[in-house]
Amino acid sequence: MHLIEVTSADTAKDFLEVQAIINAGNPNYIRPLNNEVNDVFDTAKNKNFKYGEAKRWILESDNGELVGRIAAFTNSKYINKGTDFKTGGVGFFDCINDQAAANLLFDTAKAWLSQKGMEAMDGPINFGDRDKWWGLMVEGFDKPPMYGMSYNPEYYETLFTNYGFQNYYNQYYYAMSVKDELPTRFPERHARFAAKPDYVAKHVKLSELEKYAGDFATVYNAAWAQHGEAKEITKEQVIKLFKTMKPIMDERLVWFAYYKAEPIGMFINIPDLNQYFKHFNGKLGWFQKLRLLYMSKTGKNKQLTGLAFGIVPKYQSLGIDSFMIQECSLLIKDKDWYDRYEMGWAGDWNPKMLNIYKSLGAQPSRRMVTFRCLFDASKPFERHPEMVYG
């Protein structure tokens, strides 16, 4: 086998192709967009290069066939509560079912990370935010992945654990029918807040996205700052995100809650983009964009996915979540717009979020795992600590 560092357009193209080759013949596999994967490793487009570095490798068999790939990253902004040693990341791992091949890829990433002063590696993760390509799928292979979700053959878990990776935390997805009635606590709490004029829940207007970008930043920074792992986000960053999302955004799915006009909660959902991208084989040129626009306007997508959820800490135990979710349900439940809703992942270290999922009547749909490998095997391994709520 031959390991090749990605340093050219040709090797970058091969890096993209490895995953498609490994998953060939799997009817549930949906190829990620080529440009989105490339952007992760573009120093001009990925802001994380301000805080770290990334390397990529591909693995060829002796007869020149592509049989594996891996990327490794350092990022000074990658923080986990309870971790007091430098931790790098590995991601975009794909490999044939061969432990020796997998070990060569892991060894290469480990050696590079060690040179950079890292003492452990987490993976598979992304050189970026945790909403995309984060974790290894270990349950849920019976359905296609949602947009931004990792998807891999079942044997990958064995390749990771045989090398010495351990379960750092589980990532749970939950799903439900949009048509289902919500449990009684939701309409009851909704009625309580609806009777108080100071509390308002409303969906966004696409014509006013800049205003809602500020509300998003306010809630996100307040809701997640308590955990100490999420980076603060600016209004300008959210404006950029919203502009990117606008062509496929359904304003009826993006909700905010307010108290005396101050944003205190958000419930952000979008149509599952993979229902469109599965037709594109990784491409997003002008033809695919026209097709995407057509499909998004003609009701071809019946699946929703959760993008972000948060409540400002001092309002978290009041039932604002029920108020906001019930408002959304009242609008869409009896319409023929959507059928299935699958929520974004929640870590086992965030029991409050998992309880919200369960309270909706949703059922577990998939499980991912973020693994950790300590370079010094004599060090004690500790799982991610449970979130401390403010």
Predicted regions and their residues:
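A conserved beta-strand-loop-helix scaffold within acyl/acetyltransferase catalytic domains
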Residues: 19-62, 70-80, 203, 207-310
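Acyltransferase donor/substrate-recognition loop-hinge adjacent to the catalytic core
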Residues: 150-229
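C-terminal "cap" of GNAT-fold acetyltransferases
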Residues: 175-190, 370-390
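Active-site proximal loops enriched in glycine and acidic residues that flank catalytic Cys/His/Asp
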Residues: 258-259, 267-273, 307-313, 324, ...
